[in-house]
């Protein structure tokens, strides 16, 4: 497995993995994959990675700023997505470890993750890398007409 910085040319594969996550209904409130321009503008350029298996993008991890307020400049929210065909092969762990290292080296002091309670694999992965649950945001948003809760986890760097 190769984990490397995400490049613009990776986006079609990143978008395909993202689309798989959207289709599960357990990964995100998003209902459509954003354009490269939208995705690029939202994510911090120094904290985005892809993992390759056999030369193909098998997953990605990236960080968005938690807030535009200066007081929170060192807090990021990370997302990690793994292709269905690559799950349970260490891809998510390798990606999340890369983002944690990058965030720490880049001066961030906290990473957050918001995960649906039913996404046991993601909760397990995050907890295994030191993220701790700080609460449940009840009925925080609607997905396909239904209110959803989100488990909020964070890691102090």
Language model features with spans:
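Conserved catalytic-core motifs of GNAT/GCN5-like acyltransferases
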Residues: 62-65, 112-116, 127, 132-149
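Acetyl-CoA-dependent GNAT
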Residues: 31-85, 96-97, 102, 156-157
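Conserved GNAT-fold acetyl-CoA-binding loop/helix
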Residues: 11, 15-41
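Conserved beta-strand-loop-alpha-helix junction that forms the acyl-donor binding cleft
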Residues: 87, 113-123
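Conserved acetyl-CoA-binding loop-helix of GNAT-fold acetyltransferases
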Residues: 88-101, 123-128
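Conserved N-terminal entry element of GNAT/NAT acetyltransferase domains
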Residues: 1-9
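Glycine-rich phosphate/pyrophosphate-binding loop shared by adenosine-nucleotide-utilizing enzymes
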Residues: 1, 56-60, 148
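Conserved GNAT acetyl-CoA-binding A-motif
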Residues: 103-115
């Amino acid at each position: 497995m190769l984990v490397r910085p995400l490049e613009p040319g990776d986006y079609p594969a990143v978008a395909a993995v993202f689309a798989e996550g959207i289709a599960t209904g357990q990964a995100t409130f998003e209902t459509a994959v954003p354009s490269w321009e939208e995705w690029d503008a939202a994510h911090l350029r120094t904290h985005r990675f892809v993992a390759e298996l056999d030369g193909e993008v098998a997953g990605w991890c990236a960080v968005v700023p938690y807030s535009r307020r200066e007081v929170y400049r060192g807090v990021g929210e990370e997302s990690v997505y793994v292709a269905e065909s690559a799950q349970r092969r260490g891809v998510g762990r390798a990606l999340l470890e890369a983002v944690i290292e990058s965030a720490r080296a880049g001066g961030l002091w906290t990473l957050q993750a918001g995960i649906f309670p039913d996404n046991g694999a993601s909760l397990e992965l995050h907890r295994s890398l030191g993220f701790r649950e700080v609460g449940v945001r009840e009925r925080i948003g609607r997905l396909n007409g239904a209110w959803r809760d989100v488990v909020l986890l964070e890691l102090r760097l």
